[in-house]
């Protein structure tokens, strides 16, 4: 399920997981909001698990960075979010199929590849535009870049943020994770 969710943004998987865990999408969104608050998020309200447009569903880049940090602290999430392709096994209702990672900075064969990226998630809605969350690590320093409402420069903007972050000295205040 996580491969479909993180590699292909399979909204039906997000809804299915929510219903499996909480019985209802709304109940799961409540759990998401509770966890977001625990992580220090102050500008986030979830109403669904897939991020599709809803006027009451919103977040900030800062909050998304807090959420991404918690996610990338999980080894399973890092493994799934860094997978280039995954074959979903056949079921009684569907043949086996392959899903491919949408985040271009992970793929060494792509011109947007960025050395050190250990995972990430793409997104797009008409309200949010292109969104990109990227986790990268170099020389023991882990950074998270969050881009929202981009028309087309989300990869270039992410590269610029990561380049800037990695260029900061170890003792500079911007080089450490701060809440």
Regions found by a protein language model. Name each.
Residues 23-178:
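Penicillin-recognizing serine hydrolase domain
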């Amino acid at each position: 399920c996580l491969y479909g969710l993180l590699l292909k943004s399979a909204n039906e998987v997000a809804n299915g997981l929510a219903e499996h865990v909480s019985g209802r999408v709304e109940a799961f969104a409540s759990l998401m909001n509770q966890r977001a608050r625990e992580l220090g998020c102050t500008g986030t309200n979830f109403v669904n698990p897939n991020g599709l447009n809803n006027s009451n569903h919103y977040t900030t880049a800062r909050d998304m960075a807090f959420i991404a940090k918690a996610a990338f602290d999980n080894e399973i999430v890092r493994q799934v979010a860094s997978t280039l392709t995954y074959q979903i096994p056949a079921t009684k209702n569907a043949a086996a199929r392959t899903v491919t990672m949408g985040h271009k900075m992970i793929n060494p064969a792509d011109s947007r590849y960025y050395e050190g990226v250990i995972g990430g998630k793409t997104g797009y809605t008409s309200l949010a535009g292109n969104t990109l969350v990227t986790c990268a690590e170099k020389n023991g320093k882990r950074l998270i870049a969050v881009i929202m409402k981009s028309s087309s420069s989300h990869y270039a903007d992410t590269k610029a943020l990561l380049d800037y972050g990695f260029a900061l000295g170890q003792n500079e205040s911007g080089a450490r994770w701060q809440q």
